[in-house]
Structure formats: C-alpha cells, structure tokens
Amino acid sequence: MLKLRDWQEKLKDKVIEGLRNNFLVALNAPTGSGKTLFSLLVSLEVKPKVLFVVRTHNEFYPIYRDLTKIREKRNITFSFLVGKPSSCLYAEKGAESEDIPCKYCELKGSIVEVKTDDSPLSLVKKLKKDGLQDKFCPYYSLLNSLYKADVIALTYPYFFIDRYREFIDIDLREYMIVIDEAHNLDKVNELEERSLSEITIQMAIKQSKSEESRRILSKLLNQLREVVLPDEKYIKVENVPKLSKEELEILADDYEDIRKDSLKQGKVNKIHIGSILRFFSLLSIGSFIPFSYSKRLVIKNPEISYYLNLLNDNELSIILMSGTLPPREYMEKVWGIKRNMLYLDVEREIQKRVSGSYECYIGVDVTSKYDMRSDNMWKRYADYLLKIYFQAKANVLVVFPSYEIMDRVMSRISLPKYVESEDSSVEDLYSAISANNKVLIGSVGKGKLAEGIELRNNDRSLISDVVIVGIPYPPPDDYLKILAQRVSLKMNRENEEFLFKIPALVTIKQAIGRAIRDVNDKCNVWLLDKRFESLYWKKNLKCLNANKMKL
C-alpha cells in the first residue's frame, strides 16, 4: 500500500478542493519532498488525464518512476515526447528541429505502437535502434502515443510556444496540467531567444551550396563585426544588420537544398543557414529586441507575461510547483498571473521541516560588488575555496555570478576541479568525481550545474559543501533596464527586490538544493559576500544564526 508523507496527507484535500474550485495552485515544496508523486495523486483525483510540463528530458524519469508506484493499483498509461533532434533516426548532435526535413522522409507515416514499459530515455534509445531495423519513425510514433495515454510529459516549448503547442494539437482542457520546476518560468522567454555569431555565419558559408548565398553571408559577417562587443552583458544594438526579402529568399532556397541532401545522405547535422533565417524571422515580428552579448547578436523578448498568459485561462486546471517558487506578489506582478491562486508553502503550512538541513557561514571580508572587484579580491576568493575544499567531506559545488568571475577565480586553483562550460554534461562531471577523492565543481548561477544536477550514490548526496561566490545579481545592463521599466509600470514604483533580490535568492536556493535532496541530507553553505550579513538574506536563506568568518 502506498504510504503518503505527513505533509502530503495534510495538504492533499486542500489542493484538490482548490483545483475543483478553479484556483491555480502554486506549490512550494523542497527538493526531495515528494512533489511529483503528490501532484500525480491529486491530479488524478481531479481529472482522468494529466499533462506534466518539464524543463528537460531528464525530468521525465521521476514522473515514470512515481507513476510506477501508482500503477500497482490502477491501470494508468504513460507516454512522453522528446524533440526531433533526440528521436530522429538521421539527426546528428547539434541539429535543430527545423533542420530535419520530415516532409521528405519516407518514414514519416511509418509509426508503431509505443508501450512505455522502460525508463523514457532508455525507451528512446530502443525506439531508435528498432526504427533503423524495422523502418519506422520514433518521433511520430511517440507523438501518436500521446493521444492514447492517461499521463503525458512534454518539455516547456511544447506548452509555452504557440507553434509547438498547436503542432501537437491536444485539448488542454481535458488535462490536469502540472508545471514542474516552475521557478524557471522567469526564463521562459529564453525558449525563443536567438543569437547570431561570427562562427555561425562562417559555418553557414562553409555549408552553403550557392555562390550568391556565400556573397550575402560574407556581407552579413562584415555587418555583424561592426555592432557586436566582447562584454559579457546585454548592450542594446540600434543598427542591426539587415537582409532584404530577396536575400532571405536566396538563403531559404539554399537551406532547403541542404536539408534535402542531408536526408539523402542519412545524416542531418546542424544547418547554420537555418539558424540565420530563424534569427531574422523572429526579429521581423517586432517584439524582439536586439542586444550585443559576448561577441554575439542576441534577440530577446523581455515580456515574460507574453509566454505565461496561457496560465490565466480559467478553462485550464494548473499546478505550478517548485522547491524555490518566488513569492506570490512576484508571480502576480512580474509573471502576470491574474486568476485566483492558492499559494502553498509546504513547510509553513505544516510548521515542520520536510527537507535536509545546512549550516551557514558568511565570509565578511569579500564581495563581488562591482566597485570592489580586483585581482586581490579574486585571490581572496581562491584562498577561501582552498580552505573550504580541504575541510570538505565530499565534493564542493561553487556557484559564481558569471563565467568571467569563475574564470578569474578558478584559474588560480590547482586542486582537482571541474569547471562548467557550454559543453558540460553530467556524465563528464561524474567521470571527474570518480577519478578523484573530491572535486571543486565550478558553476554559474542558473547554469546547468547549479540547477540541473543530482549527484547521489546509494541515496547519499555527493556534495557536502555549497559555496556562493558573491551575490548572483543579474548584471545592470540594457536588458535589465528594459525589465525595470516594465516592472515599474506594472507596480507603479521601482522595485529593487523584484529585479535583483528575488531572482538571486531563487538562484542561491536552487544551488543549495543540489546538496540536500533528501530529509536526511546535511551540508555546509558558504555565503562569500559581506552583503549576506543583512537581515534580508539571513532571514530568507534561513541563516539567522550564521557563523561569520574571515581569512
């Protein structure tokens, strides 16, 4: 018999009642407290079908795992959908969905019944292996299976981006919708973010089959070099490179030829002309603003509520859940949630801790404040990391505000370390950990290692210490100024907390959550910035009795 935890028993009826009364439920429950199982149970009490919306494919597994526990009593079917790059038989690493020319593929209409009796990622591997042998399409087979399953899982784009949601064509009103890791909704606009770099254009020139295309791309490359800057912050660009309608059509014809040829060869790689076309297509909409960032031209839509407006549809039953949800007012003002909301903080509701614990230490002789940054400060931070590493019982997760600061500090350290990059993977990190007794893991706030990893062995956390190097405030750049203007209009006042403190607080809590994934986990949290001494940080990070320290 499935036994519920104390908080699940106490809040189950309250959540079900809220959902039946058409409230959007916001559930703030610590990592490892059983949110997934709880949301499954309450959802199936309200509606016969459940849609889980998650950030990454890796997050399909907890749904499959917990559904297996329920299946012992109820015959509930499960399915999921991964993107074409992950399921197409001919897609190579790096290919984008639009690069894959399904309309020319003879397997598009060849589908098989999919039975999800294995973990999702293992099933995808099996489907791809069988698909090559038996000549069927894994992607369209998975898509077809969605319409027959009781519980389905999709990644964010299939829910928040109109064209992808319309493509899968399911009636959302039939489902109880559970949006997991909902603190990430702060970055939902990044799903459509596009960038243009010298490397992209140079690779497009190499791939191009047309002399005319190469001429257009060479001109574009020269224009790009005139407007991009090396700074690791968003700087608004006024004179954006332009392509005429005729030039875009020439590139589009070239792109289509490359797509056809790649399918004929049985290898669909990333087609860089497609990236350029999608960049200009989005730019033409008008709601995207161009910025220079680290030698790239980036277009962003700063209106987060544009993507989240679907949450206000009163015909939809929705649970938002996370271990680090922002406050209710933030969700209403910044995210634009206007419908009735039942906001539940589990530990406050039951007046009891349901997560692991940690000891806090504040370094009062360092800071990442802009006017205090120097080589001497980076050396101090490196000395702190050495000190922390040698007393640590296991691996040390270090979270930096930016790649620049991470490079300046970690380059001074010769200990066993793994430093996050664009190509970082959990597999590589595990290899580094298994090769050493303990490792300094360098990560950037909101990056894949500070939020997306779970390092455990035999139900024991492999991280004993979490170090926050400076406060991970967003940089005061042109993008933040635009956000500030929009938030001020919504609130009729400026709000430092909403712009700076709450996003940084969520980032820090997520990092701490990497080490305490279970109620029995314990870790040390090192807050290396003298600004953490303020009551705001000590209260919100539950560090009122923090130990102060100096080198």
Curated annotation (Swiss-Prot):
Keyword Protein biosynthesis (UniProt): no
Catalytic activity reported: Couples ATP hydrolysis with the unwinding of duplex DNA at the replication fork by translocating in the 5'-3' direction. This creates two antiparallel DNA single strands (ssDNA). The leading ssDNA polymer is the template for DNA polymerase III holoenzyme which synthesizes a continuous strand; ATP + H2O = ADP + phosphate + H(+)
Binding site for ATP: 29-36
UniProt cross-references to SUPFAM superfamilies, sorted A to Z: P-loop containing nucleoside triphosphate hydrolases (SSF52540)
InterPro entries: ATP-dep_Helicase_C, DinG/Rad3-like, Helic_SF1/SF2_ATP-bd_DinG/Rad3, Helicase-like_DEXD_c2, Helicase_ATP-bd, P-loop_NTPase, RAD3-like_helicase_DEAD
Pfam families, sorted: DEAD_2 (PF06733), Helicase_C_2 (PF13307)
Effect the entry attributes to changing residue 136 to P: Impairs [4Fe-4S]-binding and helicase activity
Consequence of changing residue 102 to S: Does not affect [4Fe-4S]-binding nor helicase activity. Loss of helicase, retains 20% ATPase
Known cofactor(s): [4Fe-4S] cluster
UniProt KW Transcription keyword: yes
Impact upon substituting residue 514 to W: Loss of helicase and ATPase, 80% ssDNA-binding
Cofactor comment text: Binds 1 [4Fe-4S] cluster.
Enzyme Commission number(s) of this protein: 5.6.2.3
Gene Ontology molecular function, alphabetical: 4 iron, 4 sulfur cluster binding; 5'-3' DNA helicase activity; ATP binding; ATP hydrolysis activity; DNA binding; metal ion binding
Outcome when changing residue 35 to A: Abolishes helicase activity but not [4Fe-4S]-binding
Domain remark text: [4Fe-4S]-binding is required for protein stability and helicase activity.
Name of this protein: ATP-dependent DNA helicase XPD
Species this protein is from: Sulfolobus acidocaldarius (strain ATCC 33909 / DSM 639 / JCM 8929 / NBRC 15157 / NCIMB 11770)
